[in-house]
Regions:
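N-terminal basic, low-complexity leaders that serve as flexible interaction/assembly modules and, when applicable
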Residues: 1-83
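Active-site loop segments of alpha/beta catalytic cores
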Residues: 1-27, 35, 106-200
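An N-terminal domain-start capping segment
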Residues: 31-49, 91-102, 138-143
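Aromatic- and acidic-residue-enriched segments that line the glycan-binding/catalytic groove
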Residues: 38-39, 73-87, 140-154
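Glycine-rich loops and low-complexity Gly/Arg-rich segments
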Residues: 42-47, 85-90, 156-160
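Short C-terminal domain-edge/linker segments immediately following a structured domain
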Residues: 48-54, 92-97, 161-166, 185, ...
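Low-complexity, flexible helical/coil segments
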Residues: 54-59, 96-106, 166-173
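A gly/proline- and charged-residue-enriched helix-loop-helix capping module
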Residues: 83-121
Length: 200
């Protein structure tokens, strides 16, 4: 699909379709499946995306927004639950020394290879609209590696450590996003939830 042409066509359409991020709610239509099972299976994720696409007249389909996925690839500890998305426990990086030592993982580390495969499978199932890969944004990923609350303070106390982590996660996310595109994703949707947070 030529996404430039798609975007131009959108501008001229008199009525606009929604672009909801409905991946996890789709689980309620999948006969007793748990979130824990969903986030660990490329096949189930693709089926869930297809189910949402079948039930909604949306502009595009987007993969699961599992905001623990990329942090887990860096070595952070993910906690899994039956009825809610995974979460990162603790901080992997708290000092400049740990930021300097942080290694950029290969795509495929943790569950990232499974997520890339999920996009490839979803692209085969969903043929009537674009398929977007949901990827965490750099600052939100840095926050999961440094602790969501603590990064707000570290920005002031050790800004160089935050910059070092941001450089490394950005490098990784570019490679990861390209892997999603190579698997067939028509685009990449970045979720940077921490950008709107601040401390007083």
């Amino acid at each position: 699909m030529n996404m430039y042409s798609w975007l131009e066509e959108l501008k001229t359409q008199p009525s606009k379709k929604p672009f909801p991020i409905l991946s996890f709610p789709g689980i309620q239509h999948m006969d007793g499946l748990t979130v824990r099972e969903l986030v660990c299976s490329a096949e189930l994720q693709a089926q869930c995306m297809k189910k949402v696409a079948d039930l909604t007249d949306s502009l595009a389909s987007v993969s699961l927004m599992d905001l623990s996925l990329e942090a887990e690839a860096f070595g952070a500890e993910a906690m899994f639950f039956d009825d809610e998305p995974p979460a990162i426990q603790g901080a992997l990086v708290t000092t400049q020394e740990e930021a300097d030592a942080l290694q950029i993982p290969q795509v495929g580390a943790g569950r990232t290879g499974m997520a890339v495969e999920g996009i490839r499978l979803a692209k085969q199932l969903i043929t009537d609209r674009p398929v977007f890969a949901g990827v965490i944004g750099p600052y939100s990923l840095a926050g999961r590696l440094m602790d969501v609350t603590e990064i707000m303070y570290i920005c002031y106390d050790e800004p160089e450590a935050v910059h070092e982590v941001l450089d490394k996660v950005t490098t990784y996310l570019i490679t990861y996003g390209q892997a999603m595109k190579d698997a067939g994703a028509d685009g990449v949707s970045l979720i940077n939830t921490l950008l709107g947070m601040r401390i007083d």
